[in-house]
Curated annotation (Swiss-Prot):
The keyword Glycoprotein does not apply. Residues 426-445 bind DNA. SMART domains: AAA (SM00382), REC (SM00448). It comes from the Bacteria. Member of the two-component regulatory system NtrB/NtrC, which controls expression of the nitrogen-regulated (ntr) genes in response to nitrogen limitation. Phosphorylated NtrC binds directly to DNA and stimulates the formation of open promoter-sigma54-RNA polymerase complexes. It is found in: Cytoplasm. GO terms for cellular component: cytoplasm. The gene is ntrC. Keywords: Activator, ATP-binding, Cytoplasm, DNA-binding, Nitrogen fixation, Nucleotide-binding, Phosphoprotein, Repressor, Transcription, Transcription regulation, Two-component regulatory system. GO terms for biological process: nitrogen fixation; phosphorelay signal transduction system; regulation of DNA-templated transcription. This is DNA-binding transcriptional regulator NtrC. Residues 4-118 form the Response regulatory domain.
Length: 458
């Protein structure tokens, strides 16, 4: 790969790592900690690719993107950011970024994206511009996460916002499927038009479909949990989709079951399956992105405070239990639990005992044992969860990096429980696990595990 890359980041380590990697790959690199310097280089005509952080000492990288597009149309910009929310991904797409990666990023992945961007630049292919939209006021979506699966989902959501393809959103109950559909609508060029969520009952009667179309008026129409619809209702949807008015609404659907399997079993119409499956978004269950649980819990604490329920924080032990819990009801259950804890906690700091009481004192190891019963082997439980994970992606593969994600989700609860059993004594924990103490320390840091020392009662 060749070309000149402009790197802007106030973190010296990131500048050094990117400079070394890009130079070894054959690129020339100009690196700076200043957004002003970056813009001067752009205006001088330097660079075939920009890699920029968002929060800089002298400005916001996202706010500079429209200016870069005006000065140098077709100059690709890869945004890197520690602000790991769907809002950042959407803002990057709205601002005409070529790509977006969260921190900490995977260096080989970033290098591949940089190589593709430089190749597109050489071919003089200008990246299509996403129609700019204003963000709705008061948006507070619980779509928070730094895991690879969620970041891949954010990028895909940003790409499909203004594409008129049907969208199928798959995921377990409580994962936030309807919120994702609402985000796609709210940040699209249909945001001023109605957003209508339809249940099976809304399609009953001779005028059911026509009434729905009259309500949606060219906005966004979502068929909620479409896998539960009977054959007659499915047929009504097919006939409605075959005779959509002009302007036609954006069609989306949500499901917590594998529609492909239902279709093969003869329980879901093939013609409807292909009409709804333009783009499939797979929303991971909360137990499949354990690293995001503390982020979400803190997010819901902040929302509860803004709602006037009071200011609370989790103790380290309480957060450890929250993170280790299975959360069968996913994000919805987590939010309801946090709000209940905010209301019932006796002090500003929420204790482990209070969390145990609200959760019904379910042992954290249930998250590993799963639903297979007391006698199920751990390997069988893992195999069952992995099969479910692949099924939720339909005919698509999960995001890259599955091996590391699965290992991280296994390691985190194992180390947390071992630390709890040894009273937070890292030397004893390392001995219990059979690993080097330095290795344990590195894993604690990498997995963002909270360690609390306490005296063990003998």
């Amino acid at each position: 790969m060749d070309g000149t890359v402009l790197v802007a980041d106030d973190d010296r380590t990131i500048r050094t790592v990117l400079t070394q990697a890009l130079t070894r790959a054959g690129c020339k690199v100009h690196a700076t900690a200043s957004l002003m310097t970056l813009m001067r280089w752009v205006e001088e005509g330097k660079g075939d690719l920009v890699i920029s952080d968002v929060v800089m000492p002298d400005g916001n990288g996202l706010e500079a993107l429209p200016r870069i597009a005006r000065e140098r149309p077709g100059l690709p910009v890869i945004v890197i950011s520690a602000q790991n929310t769907i809002m950042t991904a959407i803002q990057a797409a709205e601002a005409d970024a070529y790509d977006y990666l969260p921190k900490p990023f995977d260096l080989p992945d970033l290098m591949k994206r940089a190589a593709r961007a430089l190749e597109l630049k050489r071919r003089a292919q200008v990246v299509p511009k996403v129609i700019e939209t204003s963000r709705p006021e008061g948006t507070d979506l619980p779509l928070v996460g730094r895991t690879a699966a969620m970041q891949a989902l954010y990028r895909l959501v940003a790409r499909v916002m203004n594409a008129d393809l049907p969208v199928m959103i798959m995921g377990e109950s409580g994962t936030g499927k309807s919120l994702i559909a609402k985000a796609i609508h709210d940040f699209s060029d249909r945001r001023t038009l109605p957003f209508v969520v339809a249940q099976a009952a809304d399609l009953l009667g001779a005028d059911g479909p026509s009434s729905l179309l009259a309500r949606v008026k060219g906005g966004s129409l979502v068929f909620d949990e479409v896998g539960d619809y009977d054959d007659e209702t499915q047929g009504r949807i097919v006939r409605m989709l075959d005779a959509l008015p002009d302007p036609a609404p954006r069609i989306m659907a949500t499901t917590q079951v594998d529609l492909g399997a239902l279709m093969e079993a003869g329980r879901f119409r093939q013609d409807l399956y292909y009409r709804l499956g333009g783009v499939t978004l797979a929303v991971p269950a909360l137990r499949e992105r354990v690293e995001d649980i503390p982020l979400l819990a803190e997010h819901f604490l902040g929302r509860a405070e803004r709602d006037g329920l009071g200011m609370r924080r989790f103790s380290a032990e309480a957060m450890g239990l929250v993170r280790a819990y299975a959360w069968p009801g996913n994000v919805r259950q987590l939010e309801n639990t946090v709000r209940r804890l905010v209301v019932t906690a006796s002090e500003e700091e929420i204790t482990r005992t209070e969390v145990e009481f609200v959760l019904g004192n379910q042992p954290a190891v249930d998250a590993l044992r799963g639903a297979g019963g007391e006698g199920e082997k751990l390997s069988a439980s893992i195999a069952r969860h992995l099969r479910r994970y692949f099924d939720l992606h339909g005919g698509n593969l999960p995001p890259p990096g599955l091996y590391d994600r699965i290992l991280a989700e296994m390691e985190a609860p194992l180390i947390e429980i071992a630390l709890d059993a040894t009273g937070g004594n890292q030397a004893k924990c390392a001995d219990l696990l059979g690993i080097n103490r330095n290795t344990l320390r590195k894993k604690i840091t990498d997995l963002d595990i909270q360690v609390t020392r306490r005296r063990k009662l003998m």
